[in-house]
Design a protein with these regions (language model features):
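Recognition helix of helix-turn-helix/homeodomain-like DNA-binding domains
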Residues: 28-42
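Helix-turn-helix DNA-binding elements, focusing on the entry/boundary residues of the two helices
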Residues: 19, 30, 45-48
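Short, charged recognition helix plus adjacent turn
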Residues: 53, 63-70
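Short, basic-rich loop-to-helix N-cap that marks the start of a DNA-contacting helix
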Residues: 40-50, 69
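DNA major-groove recognition helix of helix-turn-helix/homeodomain DNA-binding modules
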Residues: 46-61
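Short basic helix-loop element that most often maps to the first helix and adjoining turn
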Residues: 6-25
Length: 70
């Protein structure tokens, strides 16, 4: 399951990037970003990597909670 709060968190620490801006840079719809943030959609590996690169974090930081790493 996607950790929905992490994408939103990293969007905001990256200059308060909007869902639309992140979606545009990632090549997906704004609705897709909203669904990822809401935990309703798990991104493909390609999209997870793309989002992590745009946001400047690792895939693990973006999608794996601390509990899952233990």
């Amino acid at each position: 399951m996607v950790n929905e709060t992490r994408v939103r968190y990293f969007r905001f620490i990256n200059g308060e990037m909007s869902q639309a801006e992140l979606a545009d840079r990632a090549g997906v719809s704004r609705q897709t970003i909203g669904a990822i943030e809401g935990g309703d959609y798990s991104p493909s590996v390609w999209l997870a990597i793309r989002l992590s690169r745009i946001l400047g974090v690792t895939v693990e930081e973006l999608f794996i909670s601390g509990e899952e790493l233990s």
